[in-house]
Each structure stands twice: as C-alpha cells, then as structure tokens.
C-alpha cells in the first residue's frame, strides 16, 4: 500500500503555489501565533500528557501483562497496546460536533481520570478493568488530540499550518 501511495503522490494536485524552495521547505519553521500563545501552551500540555502515557504503553505493555497480571504470552501485551492505541482514532470524530473548548475540557478530564484508573487497576491486579480503562484512555486521548489540534489550526491561515504543526510536534518530541 505504501509503495502504491509513493507512486501516486506526484499525480496529486497541490492546491498551494510553491512559495519556497525545496531546501527551505525541508527546514522546520517554528511558529506560535501571537494571539494564540495561551492556546499553544494548552495544546502542548495535551500533547505531552497524552503522548507520555502512550509512550509508556508502547514501552511497557508486555512487562505490565507479565508483572502485574501474570500473563506470559506476548499476546496479552499486544492486547494492552492495541487497547491503549486503537480506539484513539474514534475519539476525534466522536467529539467534532461539540464546542471545541467544552470537548477539550471533558476529554482531558477523562484522560486524567482514566490514567488514574490505570494506575489503580495495575496496583490491584484488576486485569479486565485495566483493559477497559486502556480503551477509555485511548478514546479520550484521540478526542483530546483531535480537538486541541483543531483549535490550534483554526488560529492560523493555510500558509502557517506546516509551521504550527512543526512547532507542536517539536514540543511533543523534545
């Protein structure tokens, strides 16, 4: 599929005129909108919080399955990782019709609550409850990230999109 996409890329019409050279377009541009600095900080907090827990799952799903729940099969760790990541794709579309500020506040509160529940269920060895909390966390993480990004993108024009995305990803990966 990736090879087909690679060969089809040159055939896709780019709606924007080329304004910079290829060399300049490869260099990341950091941009924070003057009027959206507080929003940028809020989005950065959302990204960092959700990505950190997501990275935790990517690194420690198998050890959690073995150490906390006694599952020796790699399948258990895979299920934990899948439940912690896959439902996130449903979060954004589920909240797109709601007011962005309210959707972000509610979804982030659910992220915090589900993260606390994950810690509780690991400590108590409640495997099924942990799996359910993984799915709730993932869904709310997707809602948070999609809503936060939508709010940030509404603050910039189309020529600033790549710069704002580079900036928020720089914060997330730093």
Region annotations inferred by a language model:
Residues 64-69, 97, 151-156:
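Helix-to-coil boundary motifs at intracellular loop junctions of multi-pass secondary transporters
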Residues 138-143, 149-174:
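A late C-terminal transmembrane helix in Major Facilitator Superfamily
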Residues 67-86, 163, 167:
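Loop-to-transmembrane helix entry
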Residues 102-146:
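C-terminal transmembrane helical hairpin of 12-TM major facilitator-type secondary transporters
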Residues 36-57, 131, 135-139:
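Pair of pore-lining "gating" transmembrane helices in MFS-fold secondary transporters
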Residues 76-100, 111-114:
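Transmembrane alpha-helices of Major Facilitator/SLC transporters
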Residues 57-65, 148:
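Hydrophobic/aromatic end-of-helix segments at the C-terminal termini of transmembrane alpha-helices
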Residues 2-20:
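C-terminal membrane-cytosol helix-exit motif in multi-pass small-molecule transporters
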């Amino acid at each position: 599929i990736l090879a087909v996409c690679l060969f089809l890329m040159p055939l896709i019409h780019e709606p924007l005129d080329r304004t910079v050279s290829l060399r300049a377009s490869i260099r990341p541009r950091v941009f924070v909108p003057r009027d959206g600095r507080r929003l940028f900080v809020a989005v950065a907090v959302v990204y960092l919080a959700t990505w950190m827990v997501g990275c935790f799952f990517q690194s420690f799903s198998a050890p959690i399955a073995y150490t906390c729940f006694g599952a020796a099969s790699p399948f258990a760790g895979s299920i934990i990782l899948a439940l912690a990541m896959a439902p996130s794709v449903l979060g954004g579309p589920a909240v797109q019709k709601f007011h962005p500020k309210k959707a972000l506040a509610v979804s982030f509160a659910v992220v915090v609550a589900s993260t606390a529940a994950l810690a509780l269920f690991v400590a108590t060895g409640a495997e099924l409850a942990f799996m359910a909390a993984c799915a709730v966390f993932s869904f709310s993480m997707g809602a948070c990230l999609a809503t936060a990004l939508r709010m940030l993108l509404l603050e910039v024009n189309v020529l600033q999109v790549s710069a704002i995305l580079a900036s928020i990803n720089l914060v997330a990966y730093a």
